[in-house]
C-alpha cells in the first residue's frame, strides 16, 4: 500500500468516524490546516461572497464573523489558509467554571463539525482590573487554547485586543496572561477616537504616532513580538460638522462613551469602497494630515451640511505596516476583507489591489 493511498484512506476513515459529511469536492480539503506560515495575513470576513476576490496568495487565516460558508472553508483549505470561528460570550456568564467549560466544549464541537481550524475570541467588554471577570477572561483564553490544541491539533486560538493596553474603553484585561496562553493577539489598530478627552473634533481613525507607540506599550509588557498581529482599518468615519473652519477643523457632536465626553460614535463607519466613490466628487478632494499621517476629505450632503471623512488608504496603511517587519511582529490583518470594491471596474480593481499590497509596507 502506497503512503499516499494510506493517508487518503486514513483521512476518509477519520471523517466517517466523526460522522460529519465533508462538503468539499475533495475530502482532504476537510482536514484542518496545521502548517505555520512565517508571516500571518489575518482576514476578518463578515459574510457574502466577496471572499472569492481576496488575494489568496497571501491570506493565512480567515476569521468568519458572518454565517458559516462551507464553500469558503473548502476554498481556504485549498489555498492552505485557516478558517476560524468567532468566539464571544458575556463575561459575567463564564465566571462560573461549569459555564466556561460548557462554552468551550460547544465551540470545539462546532469547529470540528464545520472542519474549521481554530477560534478568534472577540470580547470587547469593559472589565475592572482584579474583578472576577478579569480572572475569568484570562482563564477562558487559557482553557480554550488548551482544549482546541488538544482536540484539533495544529489549531489556532487568537484574541482581539484594543489598539493599546492602556485601559482603552475600560478594557482592563490581563494582557500578559492572555498573550502567554493563546497563539496570537490581533491588535485592533483602529477606532482610536472611541474616547476623545479633548476638543470634540473629527480626527484620524488610526493616527500613526499614537498607533505605533501603542505597540511599544504591548512590547514593554514583555509580550513577544511574534504574538502580535497588526490590524488596520479598511474603513473610515464620516462626521457631520457642527462647525467647520477654514483650517479644515470639523467640530462634531458630543457623544460620550465609557467616561469620555466625545467619541467617534458622532460619525458613521464607511467602507473603503464608498469612500473611493465619495472622494472623487467631494468639495476638497483627497487631503493629507501631515501630523496624523492620514487622508481625509470634505463634502456637502444634499441638505447642505458639510461632512469630514477620515480614512486609511495605501499610503497611510503602508506607513504603519512598515513597522511590522521592523519590529518582527507576527503579521498583519484588517477589518474587514469584504469592504473593498471587487467589481470589474478597472479603477476599483486597482484600488483594491493597492490596499492588499499595502499590508506589506511601502
Predicted regions and their residues:
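Cleavable N-terminal signal peptides of Sec/SRP-targeted secreted and luminal proteins
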Residues: 2-19
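Conserved, mostly hydrophobic/aromatic
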Residues: 62, 121, 185, 230, ...
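Glycan-recognition patch characteristic of GH18 chitinases/ENGases
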Residues: 20-112, 135, 143, 347-351, ...
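Alpha-helical scaffolding within the catalytic cores
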Residues: 46-50, 67-72, 102-107, 166-175, ...
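Active-site and adjacent substrate-binding regions of carbohydrate-active enzymes
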Residues: 122-146, 153-159, 163, 307-362
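Substrate-binding surface in catalytic domains of secreted glycosidases
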Residues: 105, 125-278
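A cross-domain feature marking catalytic cores of carbohydrate-active enzymes
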Residues: 45-47, 66, 85-89, 123-125, ...
